[in-house]
Design a protein with these regions (language model features):
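Charged, low-complexity intrinsically disordered terminal segments
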Residues: 2, 6-405
Length: 405
């Protein structure tokens, strides 16, 4: 299994040299801390649920050897039913199919997979397991959940990002409206590391020993004109507990011109808040987009509380009004970006299993910037006047929520 960023966080741009760019600084930092940086990759952004599932299903249809899926949850709905039907067809063709989901994620889902569903899925030849099944006294299983979203097909194609398996990524939800999210399709050397993450978790949970060259095929060399540099930063609670937090903080510290963040549950840890404040002090433009509504009660209030603090320090805060923005992305200096599963809150950064791709490519970064600029048109800029209009109760709830996290 690959090593990612070590626990010890030592990062300074002071010695980086006057000519060093933010992307080169962060890339070197990730290398020094043990994150796998690969150079032979191609990335495609999947900006809607429709885009993700069309792309995913098409590539599953062409699978020849294996399909691996690791999700926080599979919601028992039309998308999951279509997916498992397709996977069952692939099993008949001789393709190995392994699927894993988080037991708590399933339990907290309003349409969970129940034992009868799992029995039916397994009867079709699909291997499917729960990560860390919930047993009495329950509370022992509340932390260290598997929040990753990873798919690997034939060891050649990989997916990660913010979307689980559910039809509301396409249809939205009555309470919050349209769902906005971000996923990526990867091909190239970085897929090997997604595969390593999946197989490590699978073998640990099942006691199996799946592995070998068939799961890590050689990748085709891409032309330099399209090859993209990617670091897969994986968080595991014991081995690399601060990996994603440090990668975010390092990226924010290294920024020289601009930082743009979109995150649905924005209650960042102190180290990330400090990095943002330091960036503002040195004149870096910081723009943060958070949803005005959420699928989790009280979350917007806690996010608004933190956002208001950062607004007073000079950050531009946008409240997205076009539904629920569940994307977990950051763009730095129009040169590199991250897309992944980690929320900027204590749950993701201190407890859960998470995976983010740091993509060192201006083209992909500016595609995300263009999306950000479109979404600004459907957002409200947080100002002192907007803040004053919030009720005292909402401000109090935000303060309590921030205190609890």
């Amino acid at each position: 299994r690959q090593m990612c960023i070590r626990d010890r966080f030592v990062f300074s741009i002071g010695n980086a040299g006057a000519q060093a760019t933010s992307d080169s600084i962060v890339m070197n930092y990730l290398k020094e801390m043990g994150a796998p940086v690969t150079y032979n990759n191609e990335v495609k952004l999947l900006m809607t649920g429709h885009d993700k599932f069309v792309d995913l299903f098409e590539n599953i249809r062409h699978a020849r050897h294996h399909i691996h899926l690791e999700y926080f949850n599979f919601r028992n709905d039309s998308i999951a039913n279509a997916l498992f039907s397709l996977l069952a067809e692939k099993v008949k063709e001789g393709v190995e199919v392994r699927a894993m989901f988080d037991a708590f994620g399933n339990w907290s889902n309003n349409q969970p997979l129940k034992e009868r569903h799992l029995k039916s899925i397994r009867a079709q030849g699909i291997e499917i397991v729960k990560f860390d099944p919930i047993t009495f006294p329950w509370v022992n299983h509340a932390i260290h959940r598997d929040h990753r979203k990873i798919v690997v097909i034939d060891g050649k194609i990989g997916y990660t990002g913010g979307m689980n398996i559910a039809d509301y990524y396409i249809n939205g939800l009555p309470k919050i409206g349209k769902w906005h999210d971000m996923h990526i399709h990867l091909e190239g050397d970085a897929v090997r590391y997604l595969q390593g993450i999946f197989l490590t978790m699978w073998n640990r949970e099942t006691g199996q020993h799946v592995g070998g060259p068939a799961y890590f095929p050689d990748t085709q060399q891409l032309p330099d004109s399209i090859a993209e540099e990617i670091a897969i930063v994986d968080r595991t609670p014991r081995e690399t507990p601060r990996s994603i937090s440090h990668a975010y903080a390092a990226s924010i510290q290294a920024a020289q011109k601009s930082i743009r963040i979109v995150n649905p549950y924005f209650v960042p840890t102190k180290s990330i808040r400090k990095a943002i404040k330091n960036a503002l002090k040195k004149g870096t433009e910081v723009e943060i987009m958070i949803p005005a509504v959420s699928d989790i009660a009280f979350t917007p209030d806690a996010s608004f509380y933190i956002a208001h603090k950062l607004m007073k320090k000079g950050a531009k805060i946008y409240l997205f009004n076009g539904g629920f923005h569940h994307s977990k992305i950051m763009m730095v200096d129009s040169t590199f970006c991250t897309v992944g599963t980690a929320n900027l809150n204590s749950r993701s950064l201190r407890y859960d299993y998470e995976t983010n791709a740091f993509i060192f490519d201006p083209k992909i970064t500016n595609e995300l910037n263009a999306m950000f600029e479109r979404d600004v048109q459907n957002s409200t800029l947080l100002t002192p006047e907007v803040w004053k209009k919030r009720s005292g109760w909402k401000k109090f709830v935000g303060w309590v929520g921030n205190l609890m996290t």
